[in-house]
Amino acid sequence: MKDESAFFTIDHIIKLDNGQSIRVWETLPKKNVPEKKHTILIASGFARRMDHFAGLAEYLSTNGFHVIRYDSLHHVGLSSGCINEFTMSIGKNSLLTVVDWLTDHGVERIGLIAASLSARIAYEVVNKIKLSFLITAVGVVNLRDTLEKALEYDYLQLPISELPEDLDFEGHNLGSEVFVTDCFKHNWDTLDSTLNSVKGLAIPFIAFTANDDSWVKQSEVIELIDSIESSNCKLYSLIGSSHDLGENLVVLRNFYQSVTKAALALDDGLLDLEIDIIEPRFEDVTSITVKERRLKNEIENELLELA
């Protein structure tokens, strides 16, 4: 998979049997630091593309990690499909496809970092796939409650026939019928369904909440941690943060630092974040962010020409 002579971010395409494709970006560990034991897979939050996590990938690679990101099918980003057809099950299948692809390429030690809505997907699959550890940030545990807060109305109480055509979720039109139908059919919507999915979790797990998060109740995340009944789990709070971890540079840097510390700790089988990290220069983080936006635009233009 790796190509040391490749561009700063290595672009991969997973081609599916139905003609669709999932775009994957690979970031190699920096050459001047010891390479860590695990590959980090980042699952972006809803309405976030993989290039939105350029800074986190830079932090992780600066500290010796091999980093993989992807855009889900039927989501914002470079993979196939439109966001008005997105469902939680499509997000789940996209994640599973990328994990299988990594396994096929000889990557066996995977640590998963999942944010926001993708964390709910991670909780669903964590006991069904081979992971070494899990890190979630502002992870959704009660989907129905989070949707009600984000949309300012509990649309899941309505009959399918009475739903509006689209739900405006963070400026994107989410197809209401297909999304809500999938939620009920596959039991994505309740806290209890999340608790059932993580029951008996054996791998190390660190969860980050944000103390100003109005979309996810910290009490419910604590309930999730307690339900696992394992000493291999730990909860931390990102002080001063809301659900939007990129709302300002101070919050964003704290997120990068905290998650990188968690990854380093878990790479060594620890849960304590009293650990030193190598901080990339601000100019390097800015540069890689700009370069990846350009790469995204170039790929989008190529896709338009092929359409």
From Swiss-Prot:
This protein's UniProt keywords: Acyltransferase, Luminescence, Transferase
Protein name, per record: Acyl transferase
Organism: Aliivibrio fischeri
An individual GO BP term: bioluminescence
Functional summary from the UniProt entry: Acyl transferase is part of the fatty acid reductase system required for aldehyde biosynthesis; it produces fatty acids for the luminescent reaction.
Gene coding for it: luxD
Enzyme Commission number(s): 2.3.1.-
Pathway of action: Lipid metabolism; fatty acid reduction for biolumincescence
Superkingdom of origin: Bacteria
A Pfam cross-reference name: Acyl_transf_2
